[in-house]
């Protein structure tokens, strides 16, 4: 029951009409077929039925009696979720501030909302509203915030829900309790300002002039973390020009609905630093407040038109580079939505750039049984496919006649997904080399990612080392991948996400976003470092003559980073999934590559003791997302999670933990949660980024459970 509505009473589309259109490059878009004739010509696949929450009509199987039977049964189900081009698709959702950017951009640029999109976005937001107070958080499991509530309220109003609808009324009450939209963090203020529901003078300056500073300055945006600079580039361009939507009746109404006082009475300039306490994750530092005061003075007094024009022109040139080098996908959905507005206001609705962005919107939208969301990228195609391959090879099932064709298709996808060309004007657009890299999603998105490159390289090597598999990726291309990985090692020995660390650590003191942590520069991560170590070690075992001394040095330095970043309790903190369990699994895998195991390694022993001490009474492991936000291990309130349990078991097995008992208990829990058709049900959210925002990785419940079961079977045999 949601605000007096049951799920059946919410307006919804017919789930029989949805189809996932997949291209051989990994591109995926949902399309709604309206006629019975269209639907008969293209019946729904098992995969589509699964994503829509429909009955797949797969036969039930007897409960698995051994871990390898469970792994086989799991992949017998999971193979049905593989797309026609060989990758594993899924939602990449859970983030509640992405849809508002797209919907606001569409509204301002007059892009029509298809009925099926309007209906399903409303349904998604209603389904994910806080059941107690009616608001929305920064992610689906988070508490209600001004950021989430104000922006998603705007979305519902744009899409047709009136201010007196039970859903909007309850959300507005919660927003008022939180102090109204005046307490939005900076990104929320930006979206309200472009919609003409907030004054530009109430936002701390976001100036495109930063891009014109000398590049040797530590504060130059090219030294920022890639996602941060990608967002603040178009944001700064629009702020610099003060583009805003013309006032219409809806905007006039929203102006009064979003605030606790009349809109005309608000002095926005006094609220540049007003952020609701419930939203603040990283408060403004004194250093940032001083910089903002200086920038405000400059912007108000000394920003001459010729400077503004020069800065805007340069910023827009960089926007064009981003569009070109990502085939109009952009690095992610936040800057994608801002780019829609930038090209609309600069080039107009009939321009090639605007039409290209419009055509790309479907790449980010995902339909589920709860409605339509906006994914955190254009998918997780490469990332999840790499782990699926590794799980099957680790389990000894890759050459199984039932599964081999699926692995060949996966290898074909990995082959097509590798980036084989550097960006044009690479230095001018501040991009790292990408020839030989693999991305997170698709080749067209085009960004080098360290762990994606490493995990994909490992997956390719594992398959191509099996005699019965074709050699799709040439030796020269494998060497290109190794070159990319080696180019990404930081001075501390660790590996970051997209690039080398370019800026000084003190840049984190000028983080303006308020809701995210560690976003100003790259940081070295245990997960990315482990991916690099394992890939390099496996490559070295097969091709020891290529850059051998450099690989040896790289691995040595990376392992030293892993050891030095271990916490006193034996764990590691990770920034891309939840959290200490995930990081500790990867760190133990790294240590195993250099034969550091429980019996001979102090670091491995401490890590194993940490994991074993966190085991639940039922044999599983349980860790909540607050571990990420608070930096302290926190138990998940619902108890053991199959994904967390798989991670812990995998880590202990990599470490050759001498007592089989805790591992066996974990494996038993994984097997007990398996459904008669072979699947595992979705449990708590798995991923995180920027410390404070959670994101879904639903394929982890297949990739890591199958891997854990297969590893156990190889090491211990049957239970």
From Swiss-Prot:
Catalytic reaction(s) noted: (S)-2,3-epoxysqualene = lanosterol
The active site of this protein is located at 451
Alphabetic keyword roster: Isomerase, Lipid biosynthesis, Lipid metabolism, Repeat, Steroid biosynthesis
Q: Which GO BP terms, alphabetically? A: ergosterol biosynthetic process; triterpenoid biosynthetic process
Q: What is its EC number?
A: 5.4.99.7
Enzyme class of the recorded protein, top EC level: isomerase
Task: List residue spans for each PFTB repeat.
Answer: 118-160, 478-523, 555-595, 604-645
Similarity section: Belongs to the terpene cyclase/mutase family.
This protein is called Lanosterol synthase
Tell me the organism.
Pneumocystis carinii
């Amino acid at each position: 029951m949601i605000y007096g509505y049951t799920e059946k009473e919410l307006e919804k589309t017919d789930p029989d009409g949805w189809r996932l259109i997949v291209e051989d490059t990994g591109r995926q878009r949902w399309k709604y077929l309206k006629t019975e004739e269209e639907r008969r010509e293209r019946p729904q696949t098992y995969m589509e039925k699964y994503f829509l929450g429909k009955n797949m009509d797969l036969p039930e199987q007897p409960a698995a009696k051994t871990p390898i039977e469970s792994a086989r049964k799991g992949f017998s189900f999971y193979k049905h979720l593989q797309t026609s081009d060989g990758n594993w698709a899924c939602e990449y959702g859970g983030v509640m501030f992405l849809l508002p950017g797209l919907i606001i951009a569409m509204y301002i640029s007059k892009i029509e909302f298809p009925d099926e999109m309007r209906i399903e976005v409303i349904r998604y937001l209603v389904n994910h509203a806080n059941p107690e107070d009616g608001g929305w958080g920064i992610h689906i499991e988070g508490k209600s915030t001004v950021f989430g509530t104000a922006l998603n309220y705007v979305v519902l109003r744009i899409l047709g829900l009136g201010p007196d609808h039970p859903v909007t009324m309850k959300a507005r009450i919660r927003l008022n309790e939180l102090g109204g939209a005046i307490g939005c963090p900076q990104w929320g203020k930006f979206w309200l300002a472009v919609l003409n529901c907030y004054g530009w003078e109430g936002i701390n300056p976001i100036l495109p002039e930063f891009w014109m500073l000398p590049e040797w300055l530590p504060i130059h945006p090219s030294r920022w973390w890639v996602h941060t600079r990608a967002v603040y580039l178009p944001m700064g361009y629009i702020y610099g020009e003060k583009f805003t939507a013309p006032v219409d009746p809806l905007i006039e109404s929203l102006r009064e609905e979003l605030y606790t006082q009349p809109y005309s009475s608000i002095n926005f300039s006094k609220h540049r630093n007003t952020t609701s306490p419930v939203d603040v994750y990283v408060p403004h530092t004194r250093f940032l407040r001083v910089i903002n005061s200086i920038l405000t003075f400059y912007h108000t007094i000394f920003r001459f038109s010729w400077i503004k024009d020069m800065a805007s022109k340069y910023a827009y040139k960089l926007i064009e580079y981003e569009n070109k080098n990502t085939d109009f996908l952009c690095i992610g959905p936040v800057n994608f939505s801002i780019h829609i507005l930038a090209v609309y206001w600069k080039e107009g609705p009939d321009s090639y750039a605007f039409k290209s962005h419009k055509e790309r919107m479907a790449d980010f939208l995902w339909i589920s049984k709860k409605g339509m969301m906006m994914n955190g990228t254009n998918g997780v195609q490469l990332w999840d496919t790499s782990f699926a391959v590794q799980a099957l090879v680790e389990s000894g099932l890759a050459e199984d006649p039932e599964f081999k064709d699926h692995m060949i298709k996966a290898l074909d996808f990995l082959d097509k997904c590798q980036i084989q060309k550097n960006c044009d004007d690479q230095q001018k657009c501040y991009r790292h080399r990408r020839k030989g890299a693999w991305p997170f999603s698709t080749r067209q998105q085009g960004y080098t990612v360290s762990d994606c490159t490493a995990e994909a390289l490992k997956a390719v090597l594992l398959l191509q080392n099996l005699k019965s598999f074709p050699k799709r990726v040439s030796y020269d291309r494998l060497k290109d991948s190794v070159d990319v990985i080696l180019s990404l090692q930081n001075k501390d020995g660790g590996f970051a996400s997209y690039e080398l660390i370019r800026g000084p650590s003190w840049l984190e003191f000028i983080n303006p976003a308020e809701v995210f942590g560690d976003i100003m520069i790259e940081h070295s991560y245990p997960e990315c470092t482990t991916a690099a170590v394992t890939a390099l070690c496996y490559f070295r075992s097969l091709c020891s003559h290529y850059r051998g001394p450099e690989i040896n040095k790289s691995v040595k330095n990376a392992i030293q980073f892993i050891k030095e970043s271990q916490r006193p309790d034996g764990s590691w903190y990770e920034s891309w999934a939840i959290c200490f369990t995930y990081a500790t699994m990867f760190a133990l895998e790294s240590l195993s590559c250099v034969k550091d195991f429980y019996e001979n390694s102090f670091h491995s022993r401490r890590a194993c003791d940490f994991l074993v001490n966190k085991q639940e009474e039922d044999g599983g492991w349980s860790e909540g997302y607050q571990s990420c936000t608070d930096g302290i291990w926190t138990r998940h309130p619902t108890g053991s999670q199959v994904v967390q349990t798989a991670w812990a078991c995998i880590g202990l097995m990599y470490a050759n933990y001498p007592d089989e008992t805790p591992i066996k208990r974990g494996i038993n829990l994984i097997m007990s949660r398996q459904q008669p058709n072979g699947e595992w049900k979705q449990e708590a959210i798995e991923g995180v980024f920027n410390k404070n925002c959670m994101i879904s990785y639903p394929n982890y419940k297949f990739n890591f459970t199958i891997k854990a079961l297969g590893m156990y079977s190889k090491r211990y045999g049957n239970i």
